[in-house]
From Swiss-Prot:
It catalyses: a lipid A disaccharide + ATP = a lipid IVA + ADP + H(+). This is Tetraacyldisaccharide 4'-kinase. Keywords: ATP-binding, Kinase, Lipid A biosynthesis, Lipid biosynthesis, Lipid metabolism, Nucleotide-binding, Transferase. It holds the Pfam family LpxK. GO terms for biological process: lipid A biosynthetic process; lipopolysaccharide core region biosynthetic process. It is an enzyme of class 2 (transferase). ATP binds at residues 60-67. One of its GO terms (cellular component) is plasma membrane. It comes from Helicobacter acinonychis (strain Sheeba). The lineage of its organism: Bacteria, Pseudomonadati, Campylobacterota, Epsilonproteobacteria, Campylobacterales. Its EC number is 2.7.1.130. Belongs to the LpxK family. The gene is lpxK. Transfers the gamma-phosphate of ATP to the 4'-position of a tetraacyldisaccharide 1-phosphate intermediate (termed DS-1-P) to form tetraacyldisaccharide 1,4'-bis-phosphate (lipid IVA).
Length: 312
């Protein structure tokens, strides 16, 4: 736990001269990583499930707004399934998190992102599975007519590939470990649709239950991206690793040490604080998406003969 910008975020976005030397020393490994990732995707067995599958992904490791994007577009349709890996869950294999809004498992079993989706998407079913093809088959079994696949670009499915592109890219366009990309930056050209922040969508934030002295506590990737949206009443920022669980005793200690009047958390972090007795303020994030983007997604979905606006 630390309250300054995490090392990896500095390394990938604002590297020092010494870090730049390390980046170029590791570059041969990045080329190997890039070749393996691209080879695996292009040679993977092709699957066609005869159902519209919208993959919401990114080329950059870590958060880029995939969950808020799905939260924004999924409610526009009925008979929807959301399929995710279920990061940092304490379960393995395929787990049905919710069926049409009825939540079946705990946050720990589902993972924070999947549980957040289940809480907010009352018309959708949420499934987590390391093997996405099994998740899609389960969605079909549940009667879903549309699938939103979280982070599915690397899978060779017959799907609509949508890639989110951040407003601020990493310092170098390299793959891991020299950069933050999981595939070559040229892979953007292979997507059906590339959605760029502040061009095709904008982040809109509001604070629920604000107080005079808020202590920001978050466990998301690249947490400094929240800075532009934080209220002036934030007295300190405490960052945990992405998806990390919160230690409630540590939070209580920091709360009193900083004379805070509430913890400020994101909606994603809130699902992990159900047992927290401290006052909570919530930084709500939603996306305003260009209607042209929504129209392109609609056109793909309605290209399937049994999907019509009357039915969905």
């Amino acid at each position: 736990m630390k309250s300054d910008k995490p090392f990896l975020e500095r390394y990938f976005y604002t590297p020092t001269l010494l870090q730049k030397g390390l980046i170029f020393a590791l570059y041969p490994f990045s080329l190997i990583y890039q070749c393996i990732a691209t080879f695996k995707r292009k040679t993977a067995k092709k699957h066609d499930f005869k159902i519209p599958i919208i993959s919401v992904g990114n080329l950059i490791a870590g958060g880029s707004g995939k969950t808020p994007f799905i939260l924004e577009i999924a409610p526009r349709y009925q008979e929807v399934a959301i399929i995710s890996r279920g990061y940092q869950r304490n379960s393995k294999g395929l787990v049905v998190v919710s069926v049409k809004g009825k939540i079946l498992v705990s946050q720990n079993t589902a993972g924070d992102e999947a549980y957040l989706l289940a809480l907010n998407l009352k018309q959708a079913s949420v499934i987590v599975s390391e093997k996405r093809e099994l998740g899609i088959l389960k969605a079909l079994e549940l009667g879903s007519k549309i699938v939103f696949l979280d982070d599915g670009f690397r899978f060779n499915f017959n799907q609509f590939n949508l890639l989110l592109k951040p407003k601020v890219p990493p310092y170098y366009p390299f793959c891991l470990p020299s950069g933050l990309y999981r595939e070559s930056i040229k892979s953007y050209k292979e997507a059906h649709l590339v959605i760029t922040e502040d061009k095709d969508y904008k982040r809109i934030t509001s604070t629920t239950h604000p107080t005079k002295r808020m202590l920001l506590v978050t466990a998301i990737a690249n947490p400094s991206r929240l800075n532009a949206f934080l209220p002036k009443e934030v007295v300190k920022k405490i960052y945990f690793k992405d998806h990390a669980p919160f230690n409630l005793k540590l939070l209580e200690k920091e709360f009193h040490k900083n004379n805070a009047t509430s913890l400020l958390v994101t909606s994603k972090d809130l699902v992990k604080l159900q047992d927290c007795k401290l006052p909570l303020s919530v930084l709500d994030l939603r996306l305003e998406i260009d209607p042209k983007v929504l129209e392109k997604i609609d056109n793909y979905i309605f290209s399937y003969p049994y999907n019509t606006k009357e039915h969905l």
